[in-house]
Amino acid sequence: MKNIFFTLALLVSFSTFGQKIESLKKKTSGNTKERTLILDILRASLYQDYKQEFIFIVNTLNVSSQYAWFQGTAVRKDRREVRTNDYDDCCHVEGLLKRNYGKWYIVELEAFSTDVWYDGIWDDYNVPRALFN
């Protein structure tokens, strides 16, 4: 009985603590390719919705083996004022991405939201909560 309990405890600890999370907030020579790829995917999605080209001030970009969490501020590439709807809360952007067969895909992305839409998202997608810190 003790062996079964020990084995279960060990499996739970591996699944909980086995995820390595890396911050890509700052661009370095080692993370430039992946960081740029993730940000380009977010830019393309925002362009479809807002027809404006954006660059990001990255506040958080945490990456695990399967997921990436982004929080940042969108700024127009031409440095003009961002055009949004009257009810939008400019200019913050948050997004969850998933890596599938080596490619990143957007799972959830919200720009200029007026609420904390991502509360509990870690439970919805079974993502380590540490990714969001």
Regions found by a protein language model. Name each.
Residues 1-4:
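Positively charged n-region of N-terminal signal peptides that target proteins for export
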Residues 25-53:
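Short, non-transmembrane alpha-helical segments in secretory-pathway proteins
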Residues 49-101:
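Mature extracytoplasmic domains of secretory-pathway proteins
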Residues 92-121:
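Short beta-strand edge/turn micro-motifs at domain boundaries
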Residues 120-133:
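Extended, polar beta-sheet/loop recognition surfaces of beta-rich domains
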